A protein has these predicted regions:
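Nucleic-acid endonuclease domains
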Residues: 1-80, 89-173
Length: 173
């Protein structure tokens, strides 16, 4: 019951963010990466969403550079019902999540910048607002198993605090 209430409230907040975005922004072409400078365009997209959140009077904290969940605990009145938002950008139809998997407690705003092709249909610029659980769909169980395996290997080989093999390296940290 509590998780359902939290999810429903989060979905309403996210819909209001989507609606405000559509009211404020009609063209996303200014977010296109120029000359391979992805960090500049990423900062622009975060600033756009920040202006939407501020326009709605929402409170939030921002993640540091290269951390997941660009906006954490986004809320209006009740902080414990806050949502997490991750901003993604892509030119085509593939979204890269690097080392984090989508989950139902993260809402995604995906800027699809579009792509023109000579032979097949072009991909039009668009913005997708979606919950992480909708992204993973029926693959949820497999992804959970995958994440457990990855965490096991990270603990064994890469996390010194877990007292695994990483502590045995002499020339690597």
């Amino acid at each position: 019951m509590v998780l359902s209430l939290r999810f429903n409230h989060g979905s309403r907040v996210f819909r209001s963010i989507r609606d405000k975005f559509e009211e404020m922004i009609s063209d996303i072409s200014f977010l296109k990466t120029e000359g391979g400078n992805t960090q500049t365009s990423e900062r622009k997209s975060i600033e756009v969403i920040k202006s939407v959140l501020d326009g709605l009077g929402l409170k939030y904290s921002e993640a540091g550079s290269q951390q997941s969940k660009d906006f954490r605990s986004v809320y209006k009145n009740v902080k414990s019902l806050g949502i997490n938002i991750e901003i993604k950008k892509t030119n085509g139809l593939t979204v890269y999540f690097n080392d984090t998997l989508p989950t139902e407690d993260i809402y995604y705003i995906i800027f699809v910048m579009g792509k023109e092709y000579k032979v097949k249909d072009n991909i039009l610029p668009q913005v997708i607002f979606i919950n992480g659980s909708d992204l993973i769909g029926p693959d949820k169980t497999l992804l959970r198993e995958y994440q457990e395996d990855i965490n096991y290997l990270k603990d064994k080989w890469g996390r010194k605090k877990c007292f695994g093999k990483a502590n045995e390296f002499t020339n690597f940290s």
